[in-house]
C-alpha cells in the first residue's frame, strides 16, 4: 500500500533541532527533518505551507484513570473533596460493565488525541466482577485508534 509523503514546509516555529525547513511525513511517520532553506531529499506528494503554524511534538499524558471519564460529572460526587468523592463513586464503578468500560476508554483516548496527546498512561485499579480483562480492552482500543499507550495495574 502506497503512503503519501507530505512536506510540512517552513513552520513559523518548530521544536525539533535542525528542522527549520519542516518535516516530511510518510503515512503516519516522520521520515525526514528538513533544515532551514533546504528541500526534502526525496520527492514529496504534497506540501503544506506551515509558515503561519507552530509544529509541536505529540504530548504525553503519564497519569490517567480512563474509567473515570464516565463519572466526571456524576451528581453523587459533584463538589466533594477527594475521599468523599471516591466513596460516592466506588458503588457506581463496581457496576461498570465491559461495554461501558470500553466506551470510557475510547472517550479518554479520543479526548487525549484531540488535544495533541499521542501517548497515554492509564493507572487502572478497578477490577469489579466482569472486568477481569480490562487491560485487554484498553490495549484493543489503543490499537484501534493508533495512540501509544502504557497501562499499569494498580
What are these model-predicted stretches?
Residues 1-42, 53-55:
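N-terminal metal-binding scaffold of metallo-dependent hydrolase/deaminase domains
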Residues 17, 68-72, 129:
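Active-site-proximal flexible loops/turns
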Residues 52, 149-153:
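A structural signal for short, well-ordered beta-strand segments
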Residues 65, 125-126, 152-154:
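Active-site beta-loop-alpha junctions enriched in small/polar residues
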Residues 73-123, 128-147:
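Alpha-helical scaffold segments that flank or form the walls of functional sites
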